[in-house]
Amino acid sequence: MDSQLVLSLKLNPSFTPLSPLFPFTPCSSFSPSLRFSSCYSRRLYSPVTVYAAKKLSHKISSEFDDRINGALSPDADSRFLDRQKALEAAMNDINSSFGKGSVTRLGSAGGALVETFSSGILTLDLALGGGLPKGRVVEIYGPESSGKTTLALHAIAEVQKLGGNAMLVDAEHAFDPAYSKALGVDVENLIVCQPDNGEMALETADRMCRSGAVDLICVDSVSALTPRAEIEGEIGMQQMGLQARLMSQALRKMSGNASKAGCTLIFLNQIRYKIGVYYGNPEVTSGGIALKFFASVRLEIRSAGKIKSSKGDEDIGLRARVRVQKSKVSRPYKQAEFEIMFGEGVSKLGCVLDCAEIMEVVVKKGSWYSYEDQRLGQGREKALQHLRENPALQDEIEKKVRLLMLDGEVHRSTPLMSSSSSSASHREEEEEDSLDDFQ
């Protein structure tokens, strides 16, 4: 009964039959149907085997065509319904055990964009894709006198302007109410905690976060969060990894609580140097590496130079450069520059002009700045002076810049489950209504 038969299977790679009747290699060209052709040869010892193979190939081909056309058999439809019922039962069981909303479908929960609020620095908002994210952990680190506290105080002032509550955990015991007031902080309503140790600082911040009544908590700084065991011990005692373990344990609790409450946690951090590093960057932030993982946004701030007075004999400020080293809510590795004037804070007018130039709202040709058909001045200082003398024009330019930011970067943010179940259309109306709050 030996006969040389030419048999080949042309098979779609997404559906491969697992059967001993098909010991053949598929052809290089695929087709939804199975058929005999002269691509490969195989010796078969029984015509019954050939008949069975042909019959099974037609059956598989018809089933595959049904799958492509979306036609499900009653048995398959029944299995699908049973799986959906089992899924709903499991979700209901989890919600009854751990509380409503513990597990849900993203679409039914009202998927929304990442909610942000202004950092108070327009160029930084542009680099962040709209601002600082709500309900997330943010780390700001850099060398001494680089503007870390100033940046945090501007964020606190913006939250208070929008009617929110802010808290400052002053672990360094160096809070300056006069300087904070000059930056726009409502010091009368600012919640301040000057803790005795790191455990007290983080526990206080966690309790305020869980209350749901605080919108922003700033810890200044991680390096000053001294564990209780280190305070009670003698100076010079070796306490290995106490602060790192403290931060790791606290962040495991606080990150989830902050997300549920919609409270942003800002941690200011200092830079240390690793010993024995000859190649690469020896700089490292204090408090272990847990904060690097839990932070949704990490900002590195450094001084880019001093600002001299008009006579050139006195330093009146510094130019800060911020680099977005990590961001889970926008594109990372962007940079922002702004001027920090001593005793006054960030130059908001300079930020408006810089952003307007970047987004081509204001056009610079040569040394001249112009807005639409109106010339603002020759040189940066003249343009700033013109905007300073025309507040209405300044507000108009800033409003256009923020509208472009809302239409661009913010709408490309990562979706998540919002704590408030507002629809996308309602959010767009709120964004338009809240433009005046940015002023």
Curated annotation (Swiss-Prot):
Q: Region (Disordered) spans which residues?
A: 413-439
Q: What is this protein called?
A: DNA repair protein recA homolog 1, chloroplastic
Cross-referenced PROSITE patterns: RECA_1, RECA_2, RECA_3
Protein's organism:
Arabidopsis thaliana (Mouse-ear cress)
For this entry, the transit peptide stretch runs 1-52
Feature: compositional bias, Acidic residues: 429-439
One of the record's GO cellular component terms? chloroplast stroma
InterPro entries from the entry?
AAA+_ATPase, DNA_recomb/repair_RecA, DNA_recomb/repair_RecA_CS, P-loop_NTPase, RecA-like_C, RecA-like_N, RecA_ATP-bd, RecA_C_sf
Q: Name one GO molecular function term.
A: ATP-dependent DNA damage sensor activity
Family stated for the protein in its record: Belongs to the RecA family.
A single GO BP annotation from the record? DNA damage response
| Gene (name only) | RECA
Q: Which SMART domains match?
A: AAA
